[in-house]
Amino acid sequence: MRNLLLVAAVALSTAGCGIIYKQPIYQGNLIKQTAVEQLQVGQSKQQVSALLGTPSIPDPFHAQRWDYTSTQRVDRLARTDVKNFTVFFENEQVVRWEGDYFPAQDEQLAKSAPKQFGRNLARDKKKQRGR
C-alpha cells in the first residue's frame, strides 16, 4: 500500500511539471517581409536563394517550385501554426509566388529569441575572438 501511494505521488508530481510551462518552438524558414518585398518576376533561383535562403522542401518531382515552410508552437496545448510560402519558376526564373508567412512577427521573433533561449555568443571577449 505504501509503495502504491509513493508511485502515485511520484507520477502525479512529474505529470504536473509539463503543465506549467511549454517553451515556444519556431522551426523552418523565418521569411522576412522585406525579403518578400524584394522578390520580382524574372529573378533567378540564385537571387531567390540569396533573399529567402534554401527551400525547406527540396522536391525532385517539382523542380520548378520552391517551398518554404515554417511552424510555430506557442501555447501549452501544443497548438501549431504552419505557414507555407511557395515560389514558382519557369526557365529558371521567378514567375510568381504565393502563400503566407509570419510577416508581423519576424522582427519580434528575432528580438525575443535571446530572451527566450539565451545568448549564443560567449560573454568573455577572449572567447569571442577564438583565443
Swiss-Prot record:
Question: What parts of the sequence cross the membrane?
Answer: none
**What InterPro entries does UniProt report for this protein, alphabetically?**
BamE, BamE-like, BamE_dom
Q: Where in the cell is it found?
A: Cell outer membrane
Coiled-coil-forming residues are none
What are the lipidation residues for N-palmitoyl cysteine?
17
Note down the stretches annotated as region Disordered.
112-131
Q: Which Pfam families match?
A: BamE
Where it mainly occurs, coarsely classed, is membrane
Similarity comment: family membership:
Belongs to the BamE family.
How it assembles, according to the record, is: Part of the Bam complex.
This chain belongs to the protein called Outer membrane protein assembly factor BamE
